[in-house]
A protein has these predicted regions:
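Extracytosolic and intramembrane catalytic regions of membrane-associated proteins
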Residues: 40-164
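Transmembrane helix-bundle segments that form internal channels/tunnels in multi-pass membrane proteins
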Residues: 1-42
Length: 164
């Protein structure tokens, strides 16, 4: 005998799908070694700022974003400009995001960018949201999300958790 209870599974599934779709996507991501970062551009897709060769992190970010591209896809560099001391790109709201490779890039990038990633120690007077050596060595990989007036961080190794 069929009862109205059979519809409860559909209700739960619909709720789970709605909850998953409502989960906000991060605006920027940085790998646990601080050498590879990604940002969400104007088209809503991830673009990659590469200093390192961490294709594993890129593959995982793309999979989590339901993006069929591979880490070697040329379109991951769309909107990214690089030189010898770093790379820059634009977030969806047109603010700059950068990854610093050479210390000489800090002065300009800290003054112009909203977010600066680096695997180096950064200067104390940087005006940007920084994810530098001190951050990723303490917390591992970092995701940043713009909440309207500031970035919120989600880290892989929060201090509130005792992990081996």
């Amino acid at each position: 005998m069929r009862t109205p209870l059979r519809w409860s599974g559909a209700f739960v599934a619909t709720g789970a799908i709605a909850w998953a779709l409502a989960t906000p996507q991060p605006d920027t991501l940085v790998a646990g070694d601080g050498q590879t970062a990604a940002f969400r551009g104007k088209d809503g897709r991830l673009a990659v700022l590469r200093a390192g060769r961490d294709t594993f992190a890129i593959k995982e970010w793309l999979a989590a974003d339901a993006d069929a591209r591979t880490p070697k896809d040329g379109s991951l560099g769309n909107g990214v400009t690089c030189d010898a001391v770093g790379c820059i790109g634009r977030l969806a709201d047109s603010r700059l995001v950068s990854i610093v490779v050479g210390i000489e890039a800090f002065a300009e990038d800290c003054a112009r960018a909203a977010v600066v990633f680096s695997d180096r120690e950064s200067p104390a007077d940087c005006n940007a949201m920084l994810v530098d050596r001190a951050i990723w060595q303490s917390y591992g990989a970092v995701a940043l999300q713009w909440t309207g007036d500031r970035f919120t961080q989600t880290v892989a190794l929060p201090r509130s958790q005792d992990r081996p």
